[in-house]
Amino acid sequence: MPELCRFFGIIIRMYAEPEAPHHVPHFHAYYQDHVGIYSLDPLELIAGTLPRRQQRLVEAWAELHQAELLADWQLLQRGRRPHPIKPLE
């Protein structure tokens, strides 16, 4: 699963799912032993949990980069490598 970004101890990854077109565009956020899965449109936590502070950071980052996340989703579903996305600073 390609890593798209890393910031404040959070790792953002996205899976290619060419055999599962029924899945909504989404990404995975990892922080220590926690995993949160976020849909892209609408942008919301759909599975898993993150500590509240990290959840707010991921949501702020995803709002800033929603178009890039959607573009990376399309690339992955076509078997192409996604582009890295700038982290929060």
What is the meaning of each model-derived region?
Residues 8, 45-46, 53-57, 67:
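Low-complexity, charged, repeat-rich alpha-helical/coil interaction segments
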Residues 57-89:
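C-terminal structural segments of small proteins and small subunits
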Residues 1-2, 25-27, 71-72:
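Intrinsically disordered, low-complexity boundary segments flanking structured domains
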Residues 1-4, 11, 35-37, 42-43, ...:
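Generic secondary-structure boundary/loop-capping signal
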Residues 1-23:
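Short, charged/polar N-terminal "headpieces" of proteins
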Residues 15-53:
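A short, structured beta-strand/loop element
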Residues 7-9, 22-24, 33, 57, ...:
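Short connector loops at helix/strand junctions that flank enzyme active sites
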